């Protein structure tokens, strides 16, 4: 149609009517010839007419790249080179090899479900080259039809296929930055802070030299923003104030001095908050425009709460060890633990007379696929990751004055495929009840990147409260954490769930030092010397993967804790490019360790 002269008048008429209708609307900044309709002689003429009729506005047409490559076309009346969802490498290639027209991301960062995970990377390339115009995130809101309330009180949102229609796009209409009721997704929070108007360029702890960049196009920073600062140590604020007003012109760096007395132990962050100086028609004064955080160097930068959790108990009580053909049982004055010889993992954690485990522990490489996993999911399922389980080939026990060490050679395996992972797993159990895990993991290179790797623990549901130090308060991932900040957070486990209309992986927290699950009487902490991710939920990943709507979900019988070495990135591959290589979990060999510390309050 685009290159068939028989359609010339129809296409011209449509474009002319559009221009005539909207020509006096000052919000129209350029004319687009259409969407996903290819290119040809008819659009050449439509562009020529538009430019002649209204030379004051620029023109764009993303589909100009879909053409007959045996024909030479006229692009002289197109002002922009437009693309939907290009990979960063494609943008760089255009800027290096052509770059004759400004580059417009006419759609990018597809915001379907848990995502997008690549906003920061697009922001960086947009800022790096003056030929980059910016772009339009697809899209604003999830589209669904509300059908009253389910028995659990949740709104029943219907999408493609839910009304019995045979031709539909499923939940592909659920791809916005806000839910159908306009409640923000975590993706909108990510978007907001990525596009904050001010950013820290550098900070020198010794001299106090702070360099900021003003990303505004017209306003001096002194005209629109107050800058507040706070110093936190292991999540607790120890100092705060307001920076002196500084003048920084648009698109410029500015320098100021902020001398700080930096604590010499603990994980210390400087956080800058940018607040609106005065009321605007749509925003109140003191509205937060965004924030930065800077990790400050000191003598001992370890989280001191984590250090205390990791310190060995002074008491040395005897641990009795008994074995059957299937199980190893460890007993001391305060605990009874059991490890399966079939898996090398705990099947019982009884501490101070309380059973902590509802179901056996698992090594875990699966996650409930996100919308952005829709293409990699086929590779994962072809590799049978969703059917993976743990098999122990050798289990040995060594007892010494420090406790009991259980060493296992285990594999993560699945039906009909070769072994996915080889794991040398060591559990060290101290007489105090502390359990330390050490793992050396090797992955078969034939398999694709893993969804995740970690340990999944099905705790007693009475452990319904969580406290953690890491990135929060909302969910955060290796490529989706710019709206989260390091801090000490407390939450009910049920509130850590992000309730996507189409259930999927959610609620993970990135770059954590420890997480604690507890109730009013007892609890357990998971701590590591190296940062990890965790997810605490009342739903299993199998439940999330099976349900088609959030109102169908019913809570499991457990508080499910995933202690993860890493997860694959989130990305925006539901319509955009694959997850960037830097965020893929494709390590062939790695080590992971953590410590579990059960306790009784009082």
Residue spans for each PLM region:
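Intrinsically disordered, low-complexity Pro/Gly/Ser/Thr-rich segments with frequent PxxP/GP/PP motifs
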Residues: 225, 230, 235-265, 274-275
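Short acidic/polar inter-strand loop motif in beta-rich domains
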Residues: 274-283
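Extended substrate-binding grooves/exosites of carbohydrate-active enzymes
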Residues: 1-211, 215-223, 228-237
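Beta-strand/loop-rich accessory regions of lumenal/periplasmic or secreted enzymes
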Residues: 259-266, 280, 295-602
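Extracellular and select intracellular beta-sandwich modules with Ser/Thr-enriched
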Residues: 240, 287-292
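Residue-level signal for short segments within beta-strands and strand-turn junctions
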Residues: 139, 231-233, 276, 459, ...
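Short, glycine-/Ser/Thr-/acidic-enriched flexible segments
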Residues: 66, 86-88, 109-111, 142, ...
């Amino acid at each position: 149609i685009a290159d068939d002269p028989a359609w010339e008048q129809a296409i011209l008429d449509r474009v002319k009517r559009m221009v005539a209708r909207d020509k006096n609307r000052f919000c129209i900044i350029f004319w687009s010839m259409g969407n996903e309709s290819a290119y040809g002689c008819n659009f050449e003429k439509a562009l020529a007419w538009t430019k002649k009729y209204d030379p004051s506005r620029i023109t764009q047409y993303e589909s100009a790249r879909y053409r007959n490559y045996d024909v030479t076309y006229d692009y002289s009346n197109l002002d922009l080179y437009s693309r939907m969802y290009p990979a960063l490498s494609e943008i760089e290639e255009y800027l290096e090899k052509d770059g004759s027209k400004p580059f417009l991301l006419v759609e990018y960062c597809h915001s379907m479900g848990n995502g997008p995970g690549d906003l920061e990377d697009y922001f960086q390339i947009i800022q790096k080259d003056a030929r980059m115009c910016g772009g339009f995130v697809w899209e604003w809101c999830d589209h669904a039809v509300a059908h009253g309330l389910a028995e659990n009180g949740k709104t029943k949102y219907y999408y493609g296929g839910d009304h019995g229609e045979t031709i539909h796009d499923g939940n592909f209409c659920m791809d916005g930055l806000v839910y159908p009721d306009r409640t923000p997704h975590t993706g909108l929070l990510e978007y907001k802070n990525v596009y904050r108007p001010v950013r820290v360029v550098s900070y020198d702890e010794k001299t106090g030299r702070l360099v900021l960049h003003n990303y505004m196009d017209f306003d001096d920073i002194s005209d629109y923003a107050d800058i507040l600062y706070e110093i936190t140590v292991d999540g607790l604020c120890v100092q705060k104030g307001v920076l002196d007003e500084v003048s920084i012109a648009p698109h410029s760096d500015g320098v100021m001095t902020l001398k700080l007395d930096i604590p010499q132990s603990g994980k210390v962050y400087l956080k800058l908050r940018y607040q609106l100086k005065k009321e605007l028609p749509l925003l109140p004064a003191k509205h937060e425009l965004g924030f930065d955080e800077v990790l400050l160097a000191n003598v001992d930068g370890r989280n001191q709460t984590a250090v205390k959790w990791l310190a060995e108990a002074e008491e040395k009580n005897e641990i009795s060890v008994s074995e059957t053909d299937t199980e190893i049982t460890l007993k001391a004055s305060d605990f009874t633990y059991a490890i399966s010889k079939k898996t090398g993992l705990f099947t019982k954690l009884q501490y101070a007379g309380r059973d902590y485990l509802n179901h056996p522990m698992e090594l875990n490489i699966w996650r409930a696929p996100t919308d952005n996993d829709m293409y990699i999911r086929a590779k994962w399922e072809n590799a049978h990751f969703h059917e993976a389980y743990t098999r122990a080939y050798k289990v040995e026990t060594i007892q010494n004055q420090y406790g009991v060490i259980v060493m296992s050679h285990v594999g993560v395996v699945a039906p009909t495929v070769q072994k996915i992972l080889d794991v040398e797993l060591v559990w060290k159990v101290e007489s105090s009840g502390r359990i330390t895990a050490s793992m050396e993991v090797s992955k078969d290179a034939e398999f694709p990147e893993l969804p995740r790797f970690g340990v999944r623990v099905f705790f007693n549901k009475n452990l319904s409260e969580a406290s953690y130090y890491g990135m929060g308060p909302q969910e955060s991932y290796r490529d989706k954490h710019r709206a989260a900040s390091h801090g000490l957070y407390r939450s009910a486990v049920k509130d850590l769930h992000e309730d996507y209309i189409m259930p999927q992986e959610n609620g993970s927290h990135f770059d954590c030092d420890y997480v604690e699950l507890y109730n009013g009487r007892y609890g357990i902490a998971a701590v590591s010397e190296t940062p990890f991710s965790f997810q605490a939920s009342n739903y299993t990943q199998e439940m999330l993967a099976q349900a088609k709507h959030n109102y169908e979900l019913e809570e499991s019988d457990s508080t499910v804790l995933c202690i993860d070495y890493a997860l694959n990135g989130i990305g925006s591959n539901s319509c955009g490019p694959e997850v960037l290589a830097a965020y893929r979990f494709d390590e062939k060999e790695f080590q992971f360790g953590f410590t579990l510390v059960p306790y009784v309050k009082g």
